[in-house]
Amino acid sequence: MAAAVVVAGEAAAAAGAGGKKRGASRSWILFDAAGEERVLDADKYAIMHRVDINARDLRILDPLLSYPSTILGRERAIVLNLEHIKAIITAEEVLLRDPLDDNVIPVVEELRRRLAPSSATQHDVEGAEEDESPFEFRALEVTLEAICSFLGARTTELESAAYPALDELTSKISSRNLDRVRKLKSGMTRLNARVQKVRDELEQLLDDDDDMADLYLSRKLAGAASPVSGSGGPNWFPASPTIGSKISRASRASAPTIHGNENDVEELEMLLEAYFMQIDGTLNKLTTLREYIDDTEDYINIQLDNHRNQLIQLELFLSSGTVCLSLYSLVAGIFGMNIPYTWNDNHGYVFKWVVLVSGLFCAFMFVSIVAYARHKGLVGS
């Protein structure tokens, strides 16, 4: 493995800029087909000149700008913007932006391992399958595997934190648990959008054979070198899968494979389908988690409705008791008026009867109200 060498930005690419301000230099790491790696401290003009892309495509890779996940096929390069992985892949080299970023370092290590030249003692049979794959597909596979693994790991972390929090919330509804679940739900929504975008990008590529054909850089390079193609053309694309994926469309499985045919995208299709299934599985996990959160919310709402109904029942009992006591107080108020009447003369026993009858009547009235409410199903039994 060659040691990393710092290479100055290519000044010739910006020679025609005149007095214009040069773009800010950015750190890139370059891996070529021979397994050599270099660190490039190049500005955008140097990168555009090196890989033959326009400024709009390069702007997609700017970490300061918010662009969705994108895989673009150009004449001489594949432009990749997958979350933190921002790369440009050509038929002979791959450039990865910000190689010192914590999330990018594992991608650099994997590229260093997968793109390293084969050892002299290695059997040809062991490396035949990998050697037959074009360089751009090996680099593309590393980036897809990295982003799928990254999003899958984030999903697993979210699941390990969300399910216990949701179970705790169902057992005890508190402000702390509600706030915890709210934060987890917000994180799940953001992660779901990121996974969905990567999945949609892969699905869009799989649905368009022309877009997949644009990613065959080695084939286009060989076609440019040999305009006349025939049966003796370069065999870049074997029919056997290179990534262990056995998924293929029935229409292509039944048709004979013509190597070098510009419409033959079976190898790339198998590559993309494998990681499409992986990212789709991650999205299914997030969908299951979202459904679990929705079920938990429904359960909590049912509990809250039950508590609300209990409070309404209590309010009904208290209101009924208040009405009965008000009638009892009305009787006391009537007899407390300073109006002459004969009951006050030698009829002391009447006081006992008035108090007793009024109390029994109010109690009977309260019981009747409660019984009527139970009969109509307004309160629980």
Swiss-Prot record:
GO MF terms, alphabetically ordered: magnesium ion transmembrane transporter activity
GO terms under cellular component: membrane
Segments crossing the lipid bilayer: 316-336, 353-373
CDD domains referenced in this protein's UniProt entry, alphabetically: Mrs2_Mfm1p-like
Subcellular location: Membrane
Record keywords: Ion transport, Magnesium, Membrane, Transmembrane, Transmembrane helix, Transport
Pfam assignment, any one: CorA
InterPro entries: CorA_TM1_TM2 (IPR045863), MgTranspt_CorA/ZnTranspt_ZntB (IPR002523), MRS2-like (IPR039204)
Renumbered ranges of motif Required for magnesium transport activity: 336-338
Membrane topology, record value: Multi-pass membrane protein
Role according to the record: Magnesium transporter that may mediate the influx of magnesium.
Entry similarity comment: Belongs to the CorA metal ion transporter (MIT) (TC 1.A.35.5) family.
The name this protein goes by in its record: Magnesium transporter MRS2-I
Species of the source: Oryza sativa subsp. indica (Rice)
Lineage: Eukaryota, Viridiplantae, Streptophyta, Embryophyta, Tracheophyta
